[in-house]
A protein has these predicted regions:
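Active-site rim/loop-helix segments in enzyme catalytic domains that contact anionic ligands
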Residues: 1-100, 130, 242-248, 259-265
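Metal-dependent de-N-acetylase/amidase catalytic core
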Residues: 1-9, 85-268
Length: 268
């Protein structure tokens, strides 16, 4: 059986480590090949370094973090605050999807506290959608791939959407046993310590990740540390009930039965 692949597509170097890395580690333990792609270079995230220097620093940090996770690192495709939904970026991201052929795509939620996250989500969904369309040319050109792929959206920052509404996951992955490795990967992004404190009020980005991990764990009602996910609608991507994350992780992935019942009832 061919090795199955999963890719995390995030806006900035360190976003994957905040909300997705634990799930990647669990998939790797289950025998999957894992990939990391930060769409932007993160070259605006400093009060000290210029853009060119910061671009190099953050690329090196992202490579080190991917190595800690045991993931394939993919180079960034744009600069910071430059993630705009459009054909140039979509064609490049589609090429990555066609190369990786992921059964699982992890990405940001459709609504988050900053537009780079929202635009990255839109691009990831569209790149997955066009993966099997031969007449859509990727850059560089890659053959269309018609395999199934399922998209999972991570939890928004602070577990609230931009309108301050609380967001509850549709499923939780137990990351307790891999939490130390997740922290180690996030700690690779040393350049962000002072920046996140000054720009976003994070006293310590490591402690902030710890708090969110525990909060999602409490939301699960079962796990000490967890990452939460909402599964994207299936048309254009997979069979109706395809859920490869749950299939791969078994009891480490707890489905939110209340969330699923609400979907069946048509509740918001």
């Amino acid at each position: 059986m061919a090795e199955r692949a999963a890719i995390a597509i995030a806006a900035h170097p360190d976003d994957i480590e905040f909300t997705m890395a634990g799930t990647l580690l669990r998939l790797r333990e289950a025998g999957w090949k894992i990939h990391c792609l930060n769409v932007s270079s993160g070259d605006c995230g400093s009060l000290v370094h210029g853009r060119a220097a910061l671009r190099r620093i953050r690329a090196a940090e992202a490579r080190r973090a991917a190595a800690v996770l045991g993931a394939v690192h993919h180079p960034s495709l744009a600069d910071d605050i430059g993630i705009l939904y459009g054909l140039p970026l979509l064609r490049r991201l589609a090429a990555v999807i066609r190369e990786v052929r992921p059964a699982i795509v992890l990405t940001h939620p459709p609504q988050d506290y900053m537009e780079d996250h929202t635009e990255t989500c839109r691009l990831a969904v569209s790149a997955a959608f066009v993966r099997g369309i031969p007449n859509f040319a990727s850059v560089p050109r890659r053959p269309a791939w018609g395999g199934e792929t399922v998209i999972y959206h991570a939890m928004p920052h602070g577990l609230h959407d931009p309108l301050r509404r609380r967001v509850v996951a549709g499923a939780w992955v137990d990351t307790t046993a891999v939490h130390a490795r997740k922290l180690e990967a996030l700690a690779c992004h040393e350049s962000q310590h002072a920046w996140l404190r000054a720009s976003q009020g994070m006293n310590s980005y490591l402690r902030d990740m710890e708090r969110m991990s525990r909060a999602v764990g409490r939301q699960s009602g079962r796990f000490r540390h967890a990452e939460g996910w909402r599964r994207h609608s299936h048309p254009g991507f997979s069979a109706t009930d395809a859920d490869p994350l749950r299939a791969a992780l078994g009891p480490l992935c707890r489905v939110n039965a209340t969330y699923e019942r609400a979907l069946r009832r048509g509740a918001p």
